[in-house]
């Protein structure tokens, strides 16, 4: 039996002309936005966790308010992987007039330093004592990375001289030996620090390492003790445990988004420098690697003389070396970093150390830390550098006695 009148009424009530469907969709969208905003404001903005010994903790709380203030990640991309990806896609590339310098290494290699000068600094008019910020990029990065350019600009705005240490081959220069770089070998960083201190012996030097560069800074500080030539260190998104890092990067989504593209870029560096490398290993086999672990097994651990990849990862992991660090270093990490899992952070060691402080944000990803609705310019990393460098260069009177603290007094 047909009910033409009922059918007609139902069709009419659901027709687009009556606005029922559009009103429903609008209501659902409004509800979705409200739920999203409610979740964001209830769960996402949080104060970072600051883990340090009591004197260093008090120093940071007093001179670096960013360490105790709520971090508000960008509203529309606060998840860790999104923060990591959008930092690469969205950040602007400010123009920095670098002056490049080639350094030769004791083993016959070479790499580039890129200097950014502030010749008429009103804060530090004496160029012999003008503070220097030494920046170390990520594993395949250089002085041209947007995050490095922004940090260099921040250093210049604050009146400092900036210099970027480009790992061998990362600025396009050819390798002169079979060795590029690895996270456990700090010989090139030692060459850089000595070179800077010879030229500017009276200038305080702060090393800022990002990701792979942060691992180098931590390992360098652990190896040199108080004789490293640095007044302090700052790391951002450093990977504390190499085993945990490669495990995290080999999960399906992280492998697709990060591991495979990063490995491909490193393989291109090896292939581009085939001539010196093929003297010690099979280049064709090495560049078939599809993961960081495979490349480290086939190239890095072999080139740097390790028994195997596990031995290299053990030597490269700063997680076990916190007690050996005797220079103040602030370490910024995000709990949702796909490269550096939070369970690998050395919380207890930092709590007992007078020199190492961990600044852990709930969000931020890997070299992300985007904040504000339109995060094209500055981000949380810039603010951390600005306040920490100022604290180190202007208020260092609170730092020399850190070593007299008793380890039991640490807190978080």
Curated annotation (Swiss-Prot):
Coiled coil: none annotated. It comes from Mus musculus (Mouse). Keywords: Glycoprotein, Hydrolase, Membrane, Serine esterase, Signal-anchor, Transmembrane, Transmembrane helix. Belongs to the AB hydrolase superfamily. AB hydrolase 4 family. The chain crosses the membrane at residues 25-45. This is Protein ABHD1. SUPFAM superfamilies: alpha/beta-Hydrolases (SSF53474). It is a single-pass type II membrane protein. It is found in: Membrane. It is an enzyme of class 3 (hydrolase). GO terms for cellular component: membrane. Glycans are attached at residue 18.
């Amino acid at each position: 039996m047909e009910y033409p009148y009922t059918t007609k009424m139902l069709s009419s009530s659901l027709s687009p002309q009556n606005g029922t469907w559009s009103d429903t969709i609008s209501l659902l969208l409004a509800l979705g936005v409200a739920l999203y905003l409610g979740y964001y404001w209830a769960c996402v903005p949080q104060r970072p966790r600051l883990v340090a010994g009591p004197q260093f903790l008090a120093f940071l709380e007093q001179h670096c308010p960013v360490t105790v203030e709520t971090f508000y990640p960008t509203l529309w991309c606060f998840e860790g992987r999104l923060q990591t990806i959008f930092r690469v896609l969205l950040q602007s590339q400010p123009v920095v007039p670098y002056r490049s310098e080639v350094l030769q290494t004791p083993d016959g290699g070479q790499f580039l330093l890129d200097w950014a000068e502030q010749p008429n600094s009103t804060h530090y008019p004496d160029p012999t004592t003008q503070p220097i910020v030494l920046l170390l990029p990520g594993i395949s990065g250089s002085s041209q990375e947007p995050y490095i350019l922004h940090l260099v600009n921040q250093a210049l705005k604050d009146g400092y001289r900036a210099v970027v240490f480009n790992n061998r081959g990362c600025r396009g220069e050819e390798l002169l030996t079979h060795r590029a770089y690895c996270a456990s070998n700090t010989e090139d960083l030692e060459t850089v620090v000595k070179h800077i201190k010879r030229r500017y012996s009276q200038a305080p030097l702060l090393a800022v390492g990002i990701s792979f560069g942060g691992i180098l800074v931590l390992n360098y500080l652990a190896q040199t003790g108080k004789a490293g030539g640095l007044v302090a260190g700052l790391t951002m998104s450093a990977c504390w445990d190499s085993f945990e890092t490669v495990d995290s990067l080999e999960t399906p989504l992280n492998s697709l988004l990060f591991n495979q593209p990063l490995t491909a870029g490193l393989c291109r560096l090896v292939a581009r420098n085939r001539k010196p490398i093929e003297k010690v290993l099979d280049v064709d086999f090495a560049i078939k690697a599809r993961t960081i672990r495979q490349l480290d097994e086939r190239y890095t651990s072999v080139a740097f003389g390790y028994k195997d990849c596990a031995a290299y990862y053990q030597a490269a992991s700063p997680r076990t070396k916190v007690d050996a660090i005797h220079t103040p270093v602030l370490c910024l990490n995000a709990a949702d970093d796909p490269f550096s899992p939070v369970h690998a952070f050395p919380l207890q060691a930092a709590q007992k150390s007078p020199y190492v402080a961990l600044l852990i944000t709930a969000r931020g990803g890997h070299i992300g830390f985007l904040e504000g609705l339109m995060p094209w310019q500055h981000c949380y990393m810039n603010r951390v550098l600005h306040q920490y460098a100022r604290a180190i260069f202007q208020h260092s009177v609170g730092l020399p006695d850190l070593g007299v603290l008793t380890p039991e007094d640490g807190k978080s």
